[in-house]
Amino acid sequence: MCDLAVASEAATFALPGATVGVFCSTPAVGVARNIGRKRVMELLLTGQPIDARTAQAWGLINRVVPAEALDAELRRFTDLIVARSAATIALGKRTFYRQIGDSLEAAYDIASEAMACNMSYEDAAAGIDAFLGKRPMDWPSG
């Protein structure tokens, strides 16, 4: 499963296995967790593609951009992410995926533990200090 997805306006998305006698069972696992049962069943049972705008409306992708702007949008997205604390992003991703399938109570327990851990990071102290001082971030972890 990918964390983020950006597509050009020309992109289409499909689970076409049924059209050739092979049900897309394994792709359906990740797709269903993003777009829900009825929408994934539409893709699985019909094999018909959806356009990029529909994929975005359904929650399958984050952004739709003109084809000529795709590389620039991807670069902008990645530049924003790599400007963040790598240690914090790593902890956040691990925590997010660890809690996402749990009950609300269990998810809050996992997230609270991660927040407490995160606050002990050098990057957290440096980031808060830089924010309060209105200075650019300079992550100790690199």
Label each PLM-derived region with a short phrase.
Residues 6-11, 61-109, 116-117, 122, ...:
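C-terminal long alpha-helix characteristic of the crotonase
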Residues 55, 92, 131:
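Terminal peptide-recognition signature
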Residues 4, 42, 46-48, 54, ...:
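Well-ordered beta-strand positions
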Residues 20-23, 48-53, 87, 93-94:
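Mobile beta-alpha loop/short-helix "lid" or hinge segments that flank ligand
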